[in-house]
C-alpha cells in the first residue's frame, strides 16, 4: 500500500486490495452536492432559535469547517506521496473529496441562514478552541509529512 515506490498507471482490472476498491465504490455511491438539499426551512428554523442555540449551532458549523478543511487537504498531501497502489490512491482522493463536500455543505447552510456569511467565516481562525482542535488533528499529518519528506529526499546508497 505504501512505501513501495510510486504507482504508475491507474489499473482497476487488477487490484491488490479488492476491499479498498469496494470501499471506494461504495463511497462514490454516496455522492451528493450540498445545493441538491433544500434548506429553505433552515433559515426559519434558525431564526426561531434562542441566541444561545444560534451560538451553539454556528459554533458547531465553525468547528466542522475547520476540521473538514484539514481533512479535505491533508490526506492527499500526507499519504499520496507515500502511496504505491492505484486503488489506495483513489480511495484517499475520494475520501478527501468527500471532506470538501462536507465543508461546502456548511458554507451552503451558512449562506442560507446568515445575511452576511462573512460574519461567520471571518473570525473562525480567531477562536482559540476551534484553532486548537484543528491543530490537534493536523499535527499528526504534519509529523507524517516531515518524516516522509525526509525519507523521500534522502540520498540512497547502492548498498
PLM features per residue range, with description:
Residues 1-152:
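Non-heme di-metal
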Residues 151-159:
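Single conserved hydrophobic/aromatic residue that forms the stacking wall/gate
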Amino acid at each position: 500500500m505504501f512505501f513501495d515506490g510510486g504507482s504508475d498507471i491507474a489499473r482497476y482490472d487488477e487490484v491488490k486490495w479488492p476491499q479498498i476498491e469496494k470501499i471506494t465504490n461504495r463511497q462514490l455511491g454516496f455522492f451528493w452536492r450540498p445545493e441538491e438539499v433544500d434548506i429553505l426551512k433552515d433559515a426559519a428554523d434558525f431564526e426561531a432559535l434562542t441566541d444561545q442555540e444560534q451560538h451553539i449551532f454556528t459554533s458547531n458549523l465553525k468547528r466542522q469547517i475547520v476540521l473538514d478543511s484539514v481533512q479535505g487537504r491533508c490526506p492527499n498531501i500526507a499519504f499520496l506521496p507515500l502511496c504505491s497502489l492505484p486503488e489506495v490512491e483513489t480511495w484517499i482522493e475520494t475520501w478527501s473529496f468527500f471532506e470538501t463536500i462536507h465543508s461546502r455543505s456548511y458554507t451552503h447552510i451558512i449562506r442560507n441562514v446568515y445575511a452576511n456569511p462573512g460574519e461567520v467565516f471571518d473570525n473562525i481562525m480567531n477562536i482559540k478552541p476551534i484553532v486548537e482542535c484543528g491543530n490537534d488533528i493536523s499535527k499528526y499529518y504534519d509529523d507524517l509529512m516531515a518524516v516522509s519528506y525526509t525519507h523521500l529526499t534522502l540520498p540512497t546508497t547502492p548498498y
